[in-house]
Amino acid sequence: MGKTRRNRVRNRTDPIAKPVKPPTDPELAKLREDKILPVLKDLKSPDAKSRTTAAGAIANIVQDAKCRKLLLREQVVHIVLTETLTDNNIDSRAAGWEILKVLAQEEEADFCVHLYRLDVLTAIEHAAKAVLETLTTSEPPFSKLLKAQQRLVWDITGSLLVLIGLLALARDEIHEAVATKQTILRLLFRLISADIAPQDIYEEAISCLTTLSEDNLKVGQAITDDQETHVYDVLLKLATGTDPRAVMACGVLHNVFTSLQWMDHSPGKDGACDAILIPTLTRALEHVVPGGAKFNGDARYANITLLALVTLASIGTDFQETLVKGNQGSRESPISAADEEWNGFDDADGDAMDVDQKSSSGEDQEEDYEEIDVKEDDEDDDDDSITSEMQADMERVVGADGTDDGDLEDLPTLRELIQTAVPQLIRLSNLPIDSDESLTIQSHALSALNNISWTISCLEFANGENANIHNAWYPTAKKIWRKTILPILEADSADLKLATQVTSLAWAVARVLHGETPTDGNPHRKFISLYHSSKQQAGGNSNSIEEPEDPFQGLGVKCIGVVGSLAHDPAPIEVNREVGVFLVTLLRQSNNVPPAEIVEALNQLFDIYGDEELACDKEVFWKDGFLKHLEEFLPKMRTLTKGIDKRTQPELRTRADEALLNLGRFVQYKKKHAPK
């Protein structure tokens, strides 16, 4: 009978630590022997002074990439967690937290996951409790401590805050775990509410709370329910100020309002919703002046400006939920699907274009539009003030007796976005690009405009639905087109990232304006040219543009979406013809065109030529023989669709299937309704 094998692990000096092989690189091997091993030996020394000195030394050398990698090989994390953080000497503990902070900052997110699995949250909670007690105790009061002692407390606090923020960002499950730690939340509330922390610690605390409060109902409720420091009231008061802390407070409050669903139609305490934050966020943008990156003489405003732009962009996106919830019960299907550019033909709809149904001139489309009796301005004033032109456009849209922005009284957030934020965003999108900072500001301003524009473009405006929003947005959309989109197009930048941003914005704006988009300078030709030039650049340099994970977010798809929207009735027939030929040509060259672009081209053709009553149907679709090309493309589309893997690209396959189905129906419908 065999003997049970003896467990040799118990005979090791340290069962957790495995023998570490020295690196094969001579330089690293020497560095390990001369610097790393001696300092690690001192870190585990019985002598308290040696341990403290070693911890401080490691906190310094861990910044160096080579030293950091060697320290990680030698199990420095295990030593710090089990020995340094429990040291009686506060200097050692401060150095230990500094080591973990730097490692978390320099390494990938997986390192934070590793720390979490080593139960670092327990150590953080214990340290946070100690800091909280030090700050709140009256014997002795914190203010009476020696400056050196206070500095050590703030050093530990700063390291804890950075670690908490990085851990929360690393993975959703860690985010949720941190949000349940009441001691951590109490420390954050105390640092924000009590005017005791240095500016850098305060900013780190509010940044950390912003991270934790994002999409987290528990944290949102904890903030509003806090009776110890009344942090919610403090944040509200801060948000009305004019200093950088006001913008930081707005970031937290926006997350709170979103998680608690305090919206325009269901505001929270004292009418709290995002509308009260927009004026403060917009004021922060006024510090950015032409000539640049100095931000009116204070470089500190750069980060605050970016935070304000990011928060406005988030408000622009989250406002879509407000529109959905506000329309529930009063309208059916007020929002079109944002991820579908055409919903196909509905078999249940009596107006569906199906040969098996009675024909009519209606169809189920996402991009329906109202026939608006309006003439475009031939000239645009260069005055920075937007108010007068917006009012003039408004009168053209709704008539002299029409309603004005007062119709948005029940949508204060949208009103503030249109009247207060968008003018500043337009201004920032046109800043002279003379530094990396100004380029970053422009990019974030475009992102905010893009989010706001797409949220509104996904509304249903057919048959007078959401007319008040359309009337308020229409002149603003034209202003964005003239003041932001056209200048960037005319600059003809080779920056494909910028081109992608402005094309996405143009698509969102054109979806609302349709064929009434200003045609100054033939923008459809510019976007067609941009489409072709992007293909040439991508073909010549694989690194010229990063392919998005979602194939429908590529520059090519966006260019197709823009030109399709520009061709909608009542666009000039020549514009319609040029766009139609471009789209049909893409289908004929389908072997060299990505499937997502083919799908978008088909959807745009369906939308443009779906109504046989429009002039473009006869003058372009039939005169230019588009039906023949669509019939010839049908078998190619079947082959293309079958070649898309459902497992690896499920959305692309689904939308390709829909486009194929609709193409067959569209061809049959057109054949049945050919002009006589």
Swiss-Prot record:
This is Symportin 1. Involved in ribosomal large subunit assembly. Component of a hexameric 5S RNP precursor complex, composed of 5S RNA, RRS1, RPF2, RPL5, RPL11 and SYO1; this complex acts as a precursor for ribosome assembly. GO terms for molecular function: unfolded protein binding. ARM repeats lie at residues 183-216, 420-453. Residues 1-28, 325-385 are annotated as: Disordered. One of its GO terms (biological process) is ribosomal large subunit biogenesis. Keywords: Repeat. The keyword Repeat applies. It comes from the Eukaryota. Residues 338-354, 363-385 have a biased composition (Acidic residues). The keyword Nucleotidyltransferase does not apply. SUPFAM superfamilies: ARM repeat (SSF48371). Belongs to the nuclear import and ribosome assembly adapter family. Residues 1-10 have a biased composition (Basic residues).
